[in-house]
Amino acid sequence: MSIDIDWERATSGPDGELLAERIRSFIHDKFQQIVLPRFIRSVQVTSFNFGTIPPELEIRDLCDPFPDFYEEDDNENFSESSEEQSPTREPVDRYGSKVESWQANSPGSLEDHMQGRMGFNGPLRMPPGEENTGISPLRSPMNFGDINPYLFPRSRTPGIPGGTSNLGYYMPLSGLSGSQTPLGTVARGSPFSGGWPDVHGARPSRRRSEVEPDSAQSRPSTANTGNTLLSRGSMSSGDPRHSHHSQGVPGSDHGQVLEPNMPPTSSDPPLDDLPPRRMREQKAEDFQVFCRTKYAGNISLSLTAEILLDYPMPSFVGLPLKLNITGLTFDAVAVIAYIRRRIHFCFLSPEDADALIGPEIGSGGGEDTLEPNSPRRKPLSLLREIRVESEIGRKENGKQALKNVGKVEKFVLEQVRRIFEEEFVYPSFWTFLV
């Protein structure tokens, strides 16, 4: 079943301009995290435009949502019931245990409280269970798990800027892709689809950012956009295709740091005591749509940079570079899941699309279509073609000093493909609160 999109209405007007600016700012932030070659300096993304040609959408299948979409974030302190009301929370320590009443109800310091019980001259002793536990280095004085993540900005995690309405981002750093991703086993009906993976060794580290309106943080921008509020996950930003598995250090999300050769302190719980993954309850109204998306339009993206020349000495002079992406060809399978006021969105890699829908859809059809039992010749990129124009040097008498430097174009296009595939292809996905 095909879907018609009013592309002009969706991408024009104040809302369309604001969305384009947020996408521009997001891509700009990603380029600031890239290690540039020695001959390129100061990459800036200056503009983004949706163009006038809409994508073609075709619904291929409806099914139950992926299990990953039901997982709650570690920093997410609201459930379905707490979205409407915020009940009083009992004080807990950093491991989730309830704090004893002598500690929770004491208005003063611990020393004042203990001296008030035993008399001013009485010896100060710690309560049972707290003796000889040592002091954890760099331990945070507050339990960040009990603070609403929307209250405090933490701006180092990349995400969609500009305060878009209730947008979230989630990306496991397990490095799974293609035939190694669990999607292939889901399609074959393995135990992965019947229950949640084990927390030890099977749970990948992940990164998540939440974007809410009306905050004091904003991205670098060339336009006046809305503000954004970001929250940081437990992993720092980096190459998501490398595995960054958790080392099993309890309390690492709350500021505690252990050296690799340092034995754990007695206050650290064993790994078997770690809480299980928190999953939302599955309901009958939850659903997921597989939608084939084809695009061959005139979307545009403009970048500027400086090209450094090393003659007669290193970094002797910088030439201005202007690079314009004037269109692209795109063919992939999108996943849209609706789970109780949340919409999860991502694309499938060609291998995953082959396993779940079929080789004709996964490979994009046409001349790239393979026979059902034939091996894939080469992994395909979702961005099939990117049209680019580049200018290096200033115009003099209507002529360019340099044109179409292939090395610079190749580097920029590789980064555009990498950003797209790392941020939008499963197991990375985006979450919208509706």
Curated annotation (Swiss-Prot):
Q: Assembly state and interactors? A: Component of the ER-mitochondria encounter structure (ERMES) or MDM complex, composed of MMM1, MDM10, MDM12 and MDM34. A MMM1 homodimer associates with one molecule of MDM12 on each side in a pairwise head-to-tail manner, and the SMP-LTD domains of MMM1 and MDM12 generate a continuous hydrophobic tunnel for phospholipid trafficking.
Q: Which family does it belong to?
A: Belongs to the MDM12 family.
Q: What membrane topology was assigned to this protein in its record?
A: Peripheral membrane protein
Q: Which stretches are transmembrane?
A: none
Where composition is biased (Basic and acidic residues), the residues are 86-97
Spell out the residue ranges making up region: Disordered. Answer: 70-141, 181-277
Q: Which residues form the SMP-LTD domain?
A: 1-434
Subcellular location(s): the record lists: Mitochondrion outer membrane; Endoplasmic reticulum membrane
> Highest taxon of the source?
Eukaryota
* Record organism: Ajellomyces dermatitidis (strain ER-3 / ATCC MYA-2586)
Q: Which GO terms describe its biological process?
A: mitochondrial genome maintenance; mitochondrion-endoplasmic reticulum membrane tethering; phospholipid transport; protein insertion into mitochondrial outer membrane
List cellular component terms (GO): endoplasmic reticulum membrane; ERMES complex
Q: Which residues form a coiled coil?
A: none
Q: What is known of its domains?
A: The SMP-LTD domain is a barrel-like domain that can bind various types of glycerophospholipids in its interior and mediate their transfer between two adjacent bilayers.
Compositionally biased tracts (Polar residues)? 215-237
Q: Which UniProt keywords apply?
A: Endoplasmic reticulum, Lipid transport, Lipid-binding, Membrane, Mitochondrion, Mitochondrion outer membrane, Transport
Protein name per Swiss-Prot or TrEMBL: Mitochondrial distribution and morphology protein 12
The Swiss-Prot or TrEMBL record annotates one GO molecular function as: lipid binding
Q: Where is the composition biased (Acidic residues)?
A: 70-83
